[in-house]
UniProtKB/Swiss-Prot annotation:
Protein name, entry field: Recombination protein RecR
Family: Belongs to the RecR family.
SUPFAM superfamilies registered for this protein in UniProt: Recombination protein RecR
GO MF annotation: an example: DNA binding
CDD domains given in the database record: TOPRIM_recR
Lineage of the organism: Bacteria, Pseudomonadati, Bacteroidota, Bacteroidia, Bacteroidales
Keywords assigned: DNA damage, DNA recombination, DNA repair, Metal-binding, Zinc, Zinc-finger
Length: 205
């Protein structure tokens, strides 16, 4: 046991919390000590919610967004514009775009971007399922709303090459989103304007 910790159980709990993104050991310690001060019922409810999430959450069979059912609420909503599909990197980006209240179409979650340095290729992403969605018909515009990074631009170009002859309009967000920024960290007003003022994608990286 590390002499810094009075209990091996405490040390183990801190170690597990510190594995979470953005959580260092000091923050992990505060979280663990906070839980220790709570009633047993509160801690059990917290643990149960995490376990239930892991075992029962589903991914939408259409867009790959997180859902409680086979088809997510957005895809199942007849009031959404099914002729538009906004392609995003991850589920957090869906939430970011929804928060702008400037988009009423559907989504397609890739699950990442092409990144050879990280060992992520096109086959690791939900690109082929996007191609199949477009091929099924009914989609007039695909909005490429990926992060303005080299990896995001590379992914945009790859998708462009896959869809360019399929008769759909391909557009990208207006450059209100700064180069190098990830979508989820862009403020709602800027992101909303970038969606409204989106431009046709010309196939350049």
């Amino acid at each position: 046991m590390n002499q810094q910790y009075p209990s091996t159980l405490l040390e183990k709990a801190v170690g597990e919390f510190s594995k979470l993104p953005g959580i260092g050991r000091k923050t992990a310690m505060r979280l663990v000590l906070h839980l220790l001060r709570q009633d047993t019922s509160v801690v059990e409810a917290f643990g149960s919610s995490i376990i239930t999430l892991k075992h029962e959450v589903k991914y939408c069979k259409v867009c790959h967004n997180i859902s409680d059912t086979e088809t997510c609420q957005i895809c199942a909503n007849p009031q959404r514009d099914a002729s538009m599909v906004c392609v995003v990197e991850n589920i957090r980006d869906v939430m970011a775009v929804e928060a702008t209240q400037q988009y009423r179409g559907l989504y397609h979650v890739l699950g990442g971007v092409i990144s050879p340095m990280d060992g992520v290729g096109p086959g690791d992403l939900q690109i082929e399922s996007l191609v199949r969605r477009v091929a099924e018909g009914g989609i007039n515009e695909v909005i490429l709303a990926l992060s303005t990074t080299m990896e995001g631009d590379t992914t945009n170009f790859y998708i462009y090459r896959k869809l360019e002859k399929m008769g759909v309009k391909l557009s990208v967000l207006a450059r209100g989103v700064s180069i190098g920024d990830e979508l989820e960290y862009t403020d709602e007003i800027t992101l909303g304007r970038s969606i409204v003022n989106r431009t046709t994608f010309t196939g350049t990286v």
